[in-house]
Every structure is written in C-alpha cells, then in structure tokens.
Amino acid sequence: MNDYKLEEDPVTKERTFKRFAPRKGDKIYQEFKKLYFYSDAYRPLKFACETIIEEYEDEISSLIAQETHYLADKLCSEKSDLCETSANHTEL
C-alpha cells in the first residue's frame, strides 16, 4: 500500500489512488527498492481497502468458495459496483 498515493483532480475534486512505485518487472525496480519512504500517505488507501473488505465480506467469501476465475473483476464490477465493467483488475 505504500506504493500508492491519494491524488485529487484540481478540476473535478475527484479523489483517486495512483501508483507511483514501479512494479517488480520494471527496469528501475531494484534501484527503487533501495529507497525508503516514510509516510502516512497510504493510510487513506488502507482504510478504504479495509472498509470495502468489511462491507463485501460475504460476497468475497462466496466468490472464493466458488473458485471464480475472474475473482477481481467479479468483485470489483459485478458484486460491489466500485469499478467500470470494462476494467481489468489483476491486483486484488
């Protein structure tokens, strides 16, 4: 969660979490991991994730029990309506 920060669109005031850190496959990943960032900036993301998990706990358990192939997409789009249906979510 430390790889994300909360940003606010200056025009719409919409708040979203944006990833700023490289992923393991990126060329700069090894250099980036040598750095240490101390920040409470990830706390809103952690709280948002915990809230979603609490709110959709039954749906999450049901999908896991069914061994759904597209668990992230089903949870994000169909069960919670938190995402657009065309999105591909691989990070859950």
From Swiss-Prot:
Family classification: Belongs to the canopy family.
TM annotation in the entry: none
Protein name (Swiss-Prot/TrEMBL): Protein canopy homolog 1
Signal peptide positions (record): none
Organism: Homo sapiens
Disulfide feature: none
Underlying gene: CNPY1
